[in-house]
Amino acid sequence: MSPESRIVELETRQAFQDDTIQELNDVVVEQGRVIQRLQLQVAELIKRYEEMVGQYGSEGEEAPPPHY
């Protein structure tokens, strides 16, 4: 293999690797956005749960059923 053909081969590989790195970066950025949205949703669900527990009390505070 001549030095020129080796250089061409290495440049070709680098070009493909650059494309792959960019694609992977795009995926990581999108996953970061998804994670951020999910964190906001979980925080909202926790807030709603805590509000519901505050309204109805915890399980230990429930009055006995009427038939007792």
UniProtKB/Swiss-Prot annotation:
InterPro entries tied to this protein: SlyX
Organism superkingdom: Bacteria
Gene3D superfamilies the UniProt entry points to: 1.20.5.300
Matches recorded under HAMAP family: SlyX
Family, similarity comment: Belongs to the SlyX family.
Protein name in the entry: Protein SlyX homolog
Species the sequence originates in: Pseudomonas putida (strain W619)
Gene that produces this protein: slyX
